[in-house]
UniProtKB/Swiss-Prot annotation:
Source organism phylogeny: Bacteria, Pseudomonadati, Pseudomonadota, Alphaproteobacteria, Hyphomicrobiales
InterPro entries (UniProt xref): ACP, ACP-like_sf, PP-bd_ACP, Ppantetheine_attach_site
PROSITE patterns membership: CARRIER, PHOSPHOPANTETHEINE
Lineage: superkingdom: Bacteria
Pathway given in the UniProt record: Glycolipid biosynthesis; KDO(2)-lipid A biosynthesis
Predominant cellular place of this UniProt entry's protein: cytoplasm
PTM statement from Swiss-Prot or TrEMBL: 4'-phosphopantetheine is transferred from CoA to a specific serine of apo-ACP by AcpS. This modification is essential for activity because fatty acids are bound in thioester linkage to the sulfhydryl of the prosthetic group.
Residue positions, PTM O-(pantetheine 4'-phosphoryl)serine: 37
Places the protein is found: Cytoplasm
One of the GO biological process terms: lipid A biosynthetic process
UniProt GO MF annotations: acyl binding; acyl carrier activity
UniProt function note: Carrier of the growing fatty acid chain in fatty acid biosynthesis. Is involved in the transfer of long hydroxylated fatty acids to lipid A. Is acylated predominantly with 27-hydroxyoctacosanoic acid.
GO CC annotation: cytosol; membrane
Full protein name: Acyl carrier protein AcpXL
Amino acid sequence: MTATFDKVADIIAETSEIDRATITPESHTIDDLGIDSLDFLDIVFAIDKEFGIKIPLEKWTQEVNEGKVSTEEYFVLKNLCAKIDELKAAKA
């Protein structure tokens, strides 16, 4: 597991009161963990703050709604963490 995943999983557990032990890299934030849109906004805000980045959530949501990508592309944790790592690298 990556340091990014560990931090993101901790943020999810703290923000949504989901048991940290149930959060895996394969977890889908909505389908598996049942995180609603308001909690997800809180999680994204906390991730932005923790990593010093800005997740383009509006763009991602639009791409999913337009059928350009599947929800798994952005909302399965291992993929989300990879996107966070890309955003961190682009900022560095």
